[in-house]
Amino acid sequence: MKKRLPLLLTALCFLLCAAPLAGCTPAEEDVYGPTEKPGYPCENDEYTYLIHPESGEVTITSYLGTAEEVVVPAELDGYPVTAIQYFTIRPAAKALVKSVVLPDGLTEIGRIAFCGSALEEIEIPDSVERIGPDAFIGTPWLDAQTDEFIIVGDGVLIGCSLSEAESGAEADAPPTEMRIPNGVKHICLSFSEEPEGTYAVFIPSGVRSIGDYAFSRMNIASLSFEEGVREIGAHAFDGALHIEALELPDSLLYIGDGAFRGNESLRRIVLGKHTKHIGNYAFSSCESLISVDGLSGAARIGAYAFLYTPYFNNLTQEFVILGDGVLVAYNGRDKDVVVPEGVKSIVDAFSGKPIESVTLPSTLRSIDDYAFSYATALESVRFSAGCAPTSVGSYAFAGCTALRTVELPSSVTRIGDYAFSECAALREITLPKDLRSLGRAAFQSCTALTALTLPASLNEIGSYAFKSCPALKRIDLPDSVYALGSGAFMGCEQLTSARLPAKLTYIPDCLFLLCTRLQAVTMPEAVERIEAQAFQQCEALEEIAVPEACRDIGMSAFAGTPFLRRLHERDGAFAVLNRVLVGYDGDASEIVVPDGVERVMTMFSNYNAYEAALITSIVFPDSVTEIGELTLHGCHSLTTLTFGDGLRIVPEIKVSIRNMQAITLGRGCAYISPNAFFFSEDNACTFVVPEGSYAARWASEKAYLHRIATYE
């Protein structure tokens, strides 16, 4: 059954609620905590979305249309739609969408999905289990909510009303009882303003997860749980507790990053028997904490989990091992360190330590976040026989400026964000044959790295993965790669050739930006989209075969390349590639964009800014359906501007109408961005608009600032 809600609240969903976990007895196969799903971006006329090949699911990332009522499809490209993120992030959608019907099977509504939009009505199916931060803040939907507890989807609590009379706001008032109602499974709660007074919070047995930041703005004098909670999200109780002792339920499996950070009164913690994961900074800055019981079962204890606590400061042994073999600190003085057998994971134990070499034990199964970060004297890492870590965490070796070579075991399948960033001496690294994911900026600023072989198992390369690796000369991406991040090879000045995966459907923004010696790129026929600045300033790139099916080419994609100059030599002033205008290089003061052009994302760049300033008139034909925000950048002398009937959305082109005489809007115009035109009271501009159209209604609202003329 779906719920059609009017909406608002004093409190509302903030950060991601966790996936549901049925039952109260933890099982070994349970999946808990947030998960990241790699995917490749796609686009149709209505949506941008990610397809996740491993799970066979789709996440919608934005709505491109202009309809007031939207029915979200249950499938895209044959895959079920299970998540929505940033749905109304685009200005047109934010202003126009008033009603949304979400499909059965949807499990997640992501952060700021409808934030600040005109949404008045929404159908949320019972399948929804997660609702992210600020998902509905600033919408009429929220403003209409009157229930004390607002519960949607599969028992997701997104808000509650706490009046001053109920809040125990008086200085001597006892804590106000806050009992989460029965039927709630997931608490995705936060408040637009900090509730006054103190509270006694009771979490009943039906609750399975507490979302990020859920109680972080409250003052809690008492907190009690019944068995059942499996997950506490990031910063859920950050700075909120005014208690000395905390006992967590045995059902609890996962404690997120910073979940209990900064609770200065907290002296003693008793963890549940089944707690497996304690996130980064989970109990950091609990300045009174002296006792932690129940750590023995924890397989993962995050970086700096107990930083700035008396409890951690009193752990003075050479190797501080907590939980199930987690090395959290090294207090020794040896420069050549042999980590003892029995250690299964290493977090920030060697961060900033003056060690020169380390030998890792056969029992090691993960190198976690910040493990050796900024150990600037570290030259070598040895893996004992049988040592089989499956992952290298974020910042694990970041800033290890003396590290020259690394041969990772074949067991490693994931390298985290910034894992080897700023390893300035790193010349060679052997990547494991089963590696599947390279994180964001994983090798950024490895200035000595000349070559590496990417394994055939690799699926995902994060944004800026090899940014500013000036010695890297060649890169071959295996055909297994389907997710490629922005600027992955940006600033690789010595890179001369690159081969892209055969099934890659897009070239991400800034991919080869400032690769000044890049001469040859093998682009697959599957590519349908080249994003902004993808090849900008590739000063040696004279030829590149762009597939005919590629009709979406972003702003300045080829700016500053010989390839663009050759297009101008072939086409004249207007460089057109697959019906996309990719550049203008002429000296006329009045411009008529050629008929047949469908997209205009770039006309003028820094190289012809002078010519842009001389333009007095531009006409876009009916064939143009999209223009970029910077299309008219630098056109300070414009007096007339004409948009054809094909343009649906006038983006934030930021045109001043002070000197304008006439602006003509076409019949297809469905939305004009707030910053499309800058108005002033002393102007003589006339807006020429179709009778009875959206453009006519828009112009009439600002009639005191300009003149209006209509046409049929």
Describe every region a protein language model picked out.
Residues 46-55, 65-82, 93-108, 116-130, ...:
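Structural signature of tandem-repeat unit edges
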Residues 86-92:
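Short secondary-structure subsegments characteristic of cysteine-rich extracellular domains
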Residues 87, 111-113, 133-135, 190, ...:
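Consensus positions within tandem repeat domains that build extended binding/scaffold surfaces
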Residues 677-680, 702:
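Acidic, glycine/polar-enriched metal-coordinating patches/loops
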Residues 10-20:
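Bacterial N-terminal signal peptides
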Residues 1-9:
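Bacterial N-terminal signal peptides that target proteins for export
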